[in-house]
Amino acid sequence: LDWALYKNFVEEVDITAQVVNTTLSSDDIAYFSPKMKDWHLTLTDVNADVSGPVADMSGSLRSVRTGADTKLSVDFAAQGLPDVGKGHFKADISELTTSAADVDRLAAALTGKNLPDEVLRIAKNAGKIGLTGKFDGTLTAFAADAALATEIGGATCLLQVSSLRDGCRGVLGDVKTSSLQLGELLENDLLGPLSLNVHVNGELSSEHSDAEVSGEILRLGINGYDYESL
């Protein structure tokens, strides 16, 4: 055993492990990886196979729980940890269930920022959230394919986000909803169920947004009436 490698634990020490019905704390791992010291996350019911160093890890999480409502099953590969902001991730999510409160707490732990108030409010209105899908990229440039299920309706999304010039990001995507209870989501009594197909092609930055949006509203409830093929 070469103890000198532990001075560069994140890049040099290979981890090969099978975890069964285990509880893990980021505070313990932070002893070897100080960048995780502010995460303060506890994972329970962990069943996983993991291999590689922290900076280039892959594996299968058959189950893991955190917070009050979050459960995850996923095959994954991650490069660049523990620097989440610069890391590259691949994930094939077979099950993810969570809630607004858990997402807010995870966002604060991993990025140092809570969700914006409006986003948090809308997420709470959705109730319990379920997700399956695939992700490949960084947190700011990625391709994703997801199916979302909530207590007030569902949606599917194909999304590609790319880095352009001067901090701009290109956004290309297709979104479909089926009987999404829009009024409950936005707290607007005039709105009812929404089913639509939308294609988006645009650019986003901290200073401006510009997008072409096309699609079809298959169904929209307004003031108690359902309108179709708008």
Can you say where each PLM-predicted feature lies in the sequence?
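Acidic Ser/Thr/Pro-rich low-complexity disordered segments
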Residues: Y6-V13, V103-T111
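Intrinsically disordered, low-complexity regions
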Residues: K90, A100-V103, G112, C168, ...
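Short beta-strand/loop motifs in extracellular/secreted proteins, especially
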Residues: V171
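Flexible, solvent-exposed coil segments and beta strand-coil junctions
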Residues: S25-A30, W39-L41, G52-M57, A109-L115, ...
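Extended lipid/amphipathic-ligand handling interfaces
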Residues: L1-A17, P34-M36, L43-V54, L61-R65, ...
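Charged, low-complexity, helix/coiled-coil-prone segments
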Residues: A17-N21, A100-R105, G133-A146, V175-S178
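Gram-negative outer-membrane beta-barrel proteins
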Residues: N21-D27, G67-D69, T97-A101, A141-A143, ...
